[in-house]
Amino acid sequence: MTGLSVRLFGMNSWAVLVPQAVMGVAAVAVLYATMRRIITDPTRGPIAGLIAGSVLALTPAATLMFRYNNPDALMVLLMVAAAYFLVRAIPGASWRWLTLVGIALGLAFLTKMLEGLMVLPAFALAYLLFAPTTWQRRAPHLLSAAVALVISGGWWVAVVQLWPAGSRPPTSAGRPTTRCLISHGGYNGLNRIVGGGNAVSHGHPGGWTTHAGVLRIFFSAEMGYEASWLLPAAVVAIVTGVCLALRRRLTRIEAAGFTMWSVWLVVCTLVFSYMTGMVHPYYTIALAPAAGALIGMAAVRSRSAAIVMVLAAAAWAVVLLHRARLGPASTHWFIAGAAIAAGLLLAIALTRWPRL
């Protein structure tokens, strides 16, 4: 996208950065449309969409990457687009919409390699559990999506491998003869998760590592600033969804939505927590769409959950700021006070205007 923009408008900052901002805006818009499809109530749906879109747009990792020349903006747009296609596929058990899911994820793979496929388990599970058709039909539908994914994500790899090495343009690491498969499966693939090789030394001084473990993403200051301060609120949202499901208060598409976003969030959180290769804190941008969607869904379905999520997010932000010793101590107390005030105002508003 950036290359096309530069060809059209010349090499300048606007040509490089405007496409990233446009893709960020598009990702927010597609997430809003997805939430409208999940929450079909004419009042709750737009509110859930606005909350989800606002969380995505205001998450620091997203705010950074949507104005930076990096593939993450396009990756997030394609992942959210795949979620929209899945939400369209489930109600009618449509293999055509599911094929579009595969195409979008294949393009996400080309954009950021294996990171673009972290949502694959969430999508497959949601369709398997909630598509209103027989198990015998669900398997062929998923197979069609898998074929579409392989074709859309593998055509460029195949072209590079089949192109004569002597005239092959640069692909990765700046060398014309670099094997594309090694890049996708090694340096930019499994090595990022399990370590190995010498990935950290390949011109990425910004790479950041710490001890792998589930607590890394919660207690790491770097990841905390970017997105993980939303995780306590997202956990409250997941618990809310489970309670609503057990009480049979969710429609089929709402249950599918909670499942999709929850598995998306859990898988990405575990991957980022246990990665032993090179890790950049901005990778947590992949958490933002799922966290925003879960928070939006829970907020419109449970008043108490909305209040608890506000307090949980603010409390964890204060903890992270205190651990990182960022800013004066008065800032921490100001955030805590603002969160308490917001929670009280929300509780009063919900009491006075029950339709909220």
PLM feature segments, named:
Residues 91-106, 307-310:
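Short hydrophobic alpha-helices at membrane interfaces in multi-pass membrane enzymes
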Residues 18-42:
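Transmembrane-helix motifs of polytopic, lipid-linked glycan transferases
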Residues 49-57, 105, 109:
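Short helix- or helix-capping micro-motifs
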Residues 303-356:
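Transmembrane helical bundles and short interhelical boundary loops of multi-pass, membrane-embedded
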